[in-house]
Amino acid sequence: RAMPTSKNTITQKWATRLDAKGWDAALTPPLILGGYVYVASGQFIYKMDKNTGDIVQTSERMSGNMQYAMIPLAYAEGMLFAQIGGGQIQALSATTLKSLWISEKLGGQTLSPITYKNGYIYTGTWNSDTTPGSYFCLSVTDEDPSKGNEIKYCTWKYDHKGGFYWAGAYASENYLVFGSDDGAGDAYTSILYSVNTHTGQLIDKRTDLIGDIRSTITYNNGYVYFTTKGGYLYRVAMNADGTFGAVAGYNLGGAATSTPVVYKNRIYVGVCGTGGQYNADGGHHFDVLKESASGLSLAYKVSIPGYPQAAPILSTAYENQDFDGDGKADGRVYLYFTYNAYPGGIYMLTDTPGQTSGKAEELFRPVSKQQEYCISPLCVDKDGTIYYKNDSCYLMALETNGAYLDSVTARPDTGSVNWDKRFQASETEYTLRVA
């Protein structure tokens, strides 16, 4: 089924708030497995019914804390992988939510997304701009099923001064590509690495890049793509042996940590404005770029009242529809993304081949008690339901509903009615007083 396409037809299916206390007890972005949503908060993983938001199972206490919970849980081979701090990963059974193993303590924060490939997971640690962090590989095999606290040692690790922050990897059969921090926002000291997937041995590296690489590496049609805090989008050609080819860069005009989405020679990415990362009026924008064999260029950009810091989602559900009545499919795609400012909702952009301008629309605005900053990516199930969280510690499910109210009028027999808040379709409770 298709995702919601207007603020009138999107409705909140449910919203569940965990009993989080403090930023270090925030919940992770959601992970969908079958009919359930999995999130972690503090030292626990919660399995929730995705139709109701009810918690149906809670894990045993994990060995560490999920800390700021910016990275979702990862899943592979019947296991959930949680980043519990101290440079450690804890594996739990997705069925029983009991511990299977805990990786060796490397120190620092585990802030990079986990990548799985052929029985191994990969992620990185960050300590500070001036101290080393490690990118490391772990076998997911549970060598001793009789113990839940066995220590899993790294298959390999690769160290870099400045470490790895939000640096998700692309894994092929034989090489792994990931980026590093550089210790300075606009210096030529970050590195794009390609290492042997099995041994961690260096295959190639690029050092001519500006700014921290704080995005996951996207692969498409022989190229890898990523953004930097120095304000660049890069495209790097990949050779079959894991070495790098030609590099194309585009100056976005502001910092970017959003993982780029690449589709049919278009690239979609969120960009921080120059007026302050947390200032809603800071000049933030969402960019649509064109790519060709010769390089990258801007198709257009749209203003957003907040920094679109997380990866967008692209929907092709309506790509074959004819919206302009010319008898041909328009090729329209829909982009959905969050932004790191109040009220912490969702924006949407439509794009078609050759489009040179556009306007982002507010798709969903949380009710007041659910409003907060948001650095979370969106998660979508096969029914088109959107799941996400913001810093209010609410996990929300949003679906399409063709029936909606665009206004409500209350008329007393005498006097006048005062509403406690302005009517909006997403708000379900109001207090009315007759004066």
Name the predicted role of every residue range.
Residues 1-27, 31-70, 74-435:
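Extracytoplasmic/lumenal domain signature
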